[in-house]
């Protein structure tokens, strides 16, 4: 029988079994390596209230904390919520990672330190 994908929709190579996790959206059991992962960094306060809080704040150099969340989606929820898209057969062979999104005002990241 023909193979549809090079990796059989799994990132496990040589492992017989991987622990399942639950989808963030629908709570379906998904193998850890098959789940689509998304790491979200958000401000705890929405953008509209940031200025109000900074004006009222006693500490002038206080930086509002951020919310760090790792989301795990099953394949169907990831497609439905447009985290990933359907790609053509030729496009599926393209293994380059998607371009990183950087906000316009963000400073460029410093290069890593040599060890």
UniProtKB/Swiss-Prot annotation:
Pfam family, one: Ribosomal_S26e
PROSITE patterns to which the protein is assigned, alphabetical: RIBOSOMAL_S26E
Keywords from the UniProt entry: Ribonucleoprotein, Ribosomal protein
InterPro entries in the record: Ribosomal_eS26, Ribosomal_eS26_CS, Ribosomal_eS26_sf
Annotated TM spans: none
Gene Ontology terms: biological process: translation
Superkingdom to which the source organism belongs: Eukaryota
Chain intervals with Basic and acidic residues compositional bias: 87-97
GO CC annotation terms, alphabetical: cytosolic small ribosomal subunit
Protein family according to the UniProt entry: Belongs to the eukaryotic ribosomal protein eS26 family.
The protein, known as: Putative ribosomal protein eS26-like
The species this protein was found in: Homo sapiens (Human)
Record lineage: Eukaryota, Metazoa, Chordata, Craniata, Vertebrata
């Amino acid at each position: 029988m023909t193979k549809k994908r090079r990796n059989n929709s799994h990132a496990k190579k040589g492992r017989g079994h991987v622990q399942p996790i639950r989808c963030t959206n629908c709570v379906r059991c998904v193998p850890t390596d098959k789940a689509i992962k998304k790491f979200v960094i958000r401000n705890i306060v929405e953008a509209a209230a940031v200025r109000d809080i900074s004006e009222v704040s006693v500490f002038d150099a206080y930086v509002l904390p951020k919310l760090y969340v790792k989301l795990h989606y099953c394949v169907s929820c990831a497609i439905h919520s447009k985290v990933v898209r359907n790609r053509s057969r030729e496009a599926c062979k393209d293994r380059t990672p998607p371009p990183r999104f950087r906000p316009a005002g963000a400073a460029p990241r410093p290069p890593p330190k040599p060890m």
